[in-house]
Amino acid sequence: PEQDKILPKDAIPDAREIDNLLSAAFDDNDNKAFLIFSLVIKMGLTNQEICSLNREFICHDSEGHLCFSMPPKNHISRFLIIPDDIGTLLDRYIDAENIQSGAIFLNHRKNRIKMRDTERLLASYTQKLVKSRKLRRHYTMQTLRHAAISYMLIGGASKDEVAAYTGVTGKWMNRYDRIIASDVINEAANYNIINISLSGIDNNRHE
């Protein structure tokens, strides 16, 4: 990619900042925010993909893993294995919200959530966390996705594997080279095995 398309090493949140963000949603007992942030951070879903998620996308692969069967993009279908911790959280959320079909995430008007809704949701947390110096800067949904992809690569996945999983064109994977080479980020390389804690989430909370 062009030089200006290569991400600087400080473009993404480090592991401590990610933990602070998830902890803030966790402490607020905000099921929706916690799950949305987790889907970006752990699975690298785009904002658009999260907003378009339907109950019907959830399935099991031939080995019994819980998956999202994503709609074809450029004639390519993707089956994304859902990590166990997110799968548990997703099951609890769907059950608590009584989602039988259609959109998994709704806005306050009970319509499918829009990309601007998720950005506002994230901003409501980043504003507080920046003020309390628990985040260095305001991050966007795209920034969190960059973090997810970077840590997948740091965790040992090949560029081709990550590109296929996240739906990114392979030639753009080089944009993460500077981040991967960063000593600061590599100190947090154990991010890829961080498990999302579920015990404190209130399953009865409805928004």
Predicted feature locations:
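Flexible interdomain linker/hinge and immediately adjacent N-terminus
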Residues: 1-20
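Basic, Lys/Arg- and aromatic-enriched nucleic-acid-binding interface segment
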Residues: 17-45
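Alpha-helix N-cap/helix-start motif at helix boundaries, enriched for small hydrophobics
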Residues: 36-37, 44-53, 162
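Short, basic (Lys/Arg/His-rich) helix/loop patches that form interaction surfaces
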Residues: 123-164, 168
